[in-house]
Amino acid sequence: MTGTVYKSTGSWYTVKSEKGDFVECRMKGKFRIKGIKSTNPIAVGDIVDYELDETSDAVTGTIHTIHERKNYIVRKSVNLSKQIHIIASNIDQVFLLVTIDNPPTTTSFIDRFLVTAEAYGIEAILIFNKIDTLNEQTLDDQLYLQHIYTEIGYKCLRISSTENKGVDKLKEMMVGKVSMFSGHSGVGKSTLVNAMEPSLHLKTSVISEQSKQGQHTTTFAEMYDLSFDARIIDTPGIKGFGIVDMEPTEISGYFPEFFKLKDQCKFNNCLHKEEPHCAIKAALEKDEIAWSRYNSYLKILEGDEEHYRTDIYGEDRAASDETRK
């Protein structure tokens, strides 16, 4: 029998059969997919073959084959830094929910997510959520960020889940597709899904006034069928996005605005740091590339995993003289 993994709890997997039935399955033995060393060999979105267990009183099954994935998206495992965690597979697009405040989403987090999506060939779209809560300063920050990413070529949406602003536009973009939602805890993923599909009644959280951080309401990634011919994968909130190892010379290729210029650099292996006649540095000095993007690039290049949750939005407009050297 063949089905799609809709939920993974680590040891059990909820599989939807081709007939539309849901079966709780376990994994048979150990899987290794094309040498991928991951903490979770089976991910939400996987197409699997399974057999029903004849000895069980309940309807359960055993997964014995994983079909080839058309794509998947990963990040570094939280506890095992040398391994990867597959967030989801066989997805058409990923939406990253961004909030300016309550909780704040840093540019380094956004850029690490976008670089990973670029590396795995998945379209990424930014959703600026909670626009109804913005004041004059945070609205300025939000519009500035949106300008940066729109200029690069990323689609951006402004949404208020609580006031139902922009939700219909989002639904139009999701029709006929499998979409993954990601972001920090508290950015409003579950609230947004409830706004699109109230019958799901997903649990939502309250932001801590002291830490400005959200509490986890989604424990495991889970796929849902929506009434408007769309499927969504809701993922647990994440604090940081660890980049899986990339070759230094590859990284700039996952920044679209860098990729357009890199052939103009004097050296083919230019890392866009101290090399002479670097097209990226020249564009940076002309403010044709955002300083926040360049700083994110440097942090990834230098393997700065300890501080990838730092930075904030004003660094382009007030870049220090030291940064510009």
UniProtKB/Swiss-Prot annotation:
Its cofactor is Zn(2+). PROSITE patterns: ENGC_GTPASE (PS50936), G_CP (PS51721). The keyword Disulfide bond does not apply. Signal peptide: none annotated. It is found in: Cytoplasm. GTP binds at N129, K130, I131, D132, G183, H184, S185, G186, V187, G188, K189, S190, T191. Residues 80-241 form the CP-type G domain. Binds 1 zinc ion per subunit. The keyword Oxidoreductase does not apply. One of its GO terms (molecular function) is GTPase activity. One of several proteins that assist in the late maturation steps of the functional core of the 30S ribosomal subunit. Helps release RbfA from mature subunits. May play a role in the assembly of ribosomal proteins into the subunit. Circularly permuted GTPase that catalyzes slow GTP hydrolysis, GTPase activity is stimulated by the 30S ribosomal subunit. Belongs to the TRAFAC class YlqF/YawG GTPase family. RsgA subfamily. Monomer. Associates with 30S ribosomal subunit, binds 16S rRNA. This is Small ribosomal subunit biogenesis GTPase RsgA. The lineage of its organism: Bacteria, Pseudomonadati, Bacteroidota, Flavobacteriia, Flavobacteriales.
